[in-house]
Amino acid sequence: MKKYIISLIVFLSFYAQADLTDFRVATWNLQGASATTESKWNINVRQLISGENAVDILAVQEAGSPPSTAVDTGTLIPSPGIPVRELIWNLSTNSRPQQVYIYFSAVDALGGRVNLALVSNRRADEVFVLSPVRQGGRPLLGIRIGNDAFFTAHAIAMRNNDAPALVEEVYNFFRDSRDPVHQALNWMILGDFNREPADLEMNLTVPVRRASEIISPAAATQTSQRTLDYAVAGNSVAFRPSPLQAGIVYGARRTQISSDHFPVGVSRR
């Protein structure tokens, strides 16, 4: 009985403190990193994560290779056969450093383009790697910052689209956890879902729909004039809608280099 009470207290205290609105986040399908010059990382990604309007966390799909100036911390990250690295990237000078952390998953062992990454201005308290939900699919890479978890996702395109299954996977991961702290976490999946928001919502199971919300911009996020890039926020056991909104990050859009996706930001209304 005492153990149950302690667990309940921990659960409630984490739930009370958690708030996704404390973060400014964004997602962008980079469509590769312009490997020889890394220009997309050094120009466009840098623009999103530095300066006055910098986001706290950036989810990247088709991340190519990490910037060569990023330094591997050597941290061993347990994962289900999917290599994940933690790197520190100094955006400024050695005398006045401005460091961010890159969590990089080399999903594409051949071409190297279709990799996943999360960039955070804080070091992650924990890293999550969830296996692909379908043959030929990609894993989910996530980090925990305090009481909130953020994932980068890249769903399969066309007929074999696995976007609903990816959302279900995150929901089940936290719902079924034996750790009350994990159960209480708010979570957000950011990425290229390769599916319109309304279509995704229709294909989620009822429990997942009740425990989550889709936060999407009222504009196309790809040159195809489709809205494919957005966020799904939820809590697997104690969901409350958040005052969050999504929109195209137009500053980065104007200077982006050869990606057919636009960066999408999510922040408090």
From Swiss-Prot:
The keyword Nuclease applies. Its main location: secreted. Its EC number is 3.1.-.-. GO terms for cellular component: extracellular region. The keyword Magnesium does not apply. One of its GO terms (molecular function) is toxin activity. A motif (Nuclear localization signal) lies at residues 195-210. Residues 1-18 form the signal peptide. Keywords: Endonuclease, Hydrolase, Nuclease, Secreted, Signal, Toxin, Virulence. Heterotrimer of 3 subunits, CdtA, CdtB and CdtC. The operon of the strain O128:H- / 9142-88 / EPEC is referred to as cdt type II (CDT-II). Part of the tripartite complex that is required for the CDT activity. CdtB exhibits a DNA-nicking endonuclease activity, and very probably causes DNA damage in intoxicated cells. This damage induces G2/M cell cycle arrest, chromatin fragmentation, cell distention and nucleus enlargement. This is Cytolethal distending toxin subunit B. It comes from Escherichia coli.
